[in-house]
Amino acid sequence: MKYISLSSGSCGNCHYITGRDTKIVIDAGISGKRAIEHLAMHGQSMDGLDAILVTHEHIDHIQAVGILSRKFNAPVYATEKTWENMKRHVGKIKEENVRVFRRGETLGIKNIEVGTFEISHDAVEPVGYTLTQGNQKISVVTDIGHVS
């Protein structure tokens, strides 16, 4: 797997992970244009994007979720409470592209297994993710403020 941080910090968070034939964005808290341009600087494209995973509902994590979902017909994964608190900010997303899960649930996105886990943050139901493909693992944890 390959990990690219497109942006991190209070100005916006956006992470891109690719593995074999799978493309995943974790958080899209920058403009869609900026995310696409930053990824292109790394020689990558979001064409064929398989999933957008959301850690929590703060705007610096969801700004372009709707734009990227619509442009690339990508499903958006979020916990139920996160989805309920973010849906009015992301615009219209196809019903079949809304994927709600419970913290602790394991998701399958093509050939990548995605573990979800609770994190500490001032959001309604924040999560971190561990992506596993073969013997490779990448974990993404944001905005925790302390090691838990």
What does each model-identified segment do?
Residues 1-42, 127-143:
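Conserved beta-strand hairpin/beta-sheet module of binuclear metal-dependent hydrolase folds
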Residues 4-6, 11-14, 57-61, 65, ...:
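Structured catalytic core of nucleotide-sugar glycosyltransferases
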Residues 7, 51, 99-102:
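Beta-strand->loop->alpha-helix junctions that form or flank phosphate-binding loops
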Residues 7-8, 28-30, 57, 81, ...:
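Active-site metal-binding loops of divalent metal-dependent hydrolases
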Residues 32, 62, 86, 126, ...:
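Short, well-ordered alpha-helical microsegments
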Residues 32-79:
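Active-site metal-binding motif and surrounding structural segment of the metallo-beta-lactamase
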Residues 53, 115, 140:
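Conserved Rossmann-like nucleotide-binding pocket used by diverse enzymes
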Residues 80-135:
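Metallo-beta-lactamase
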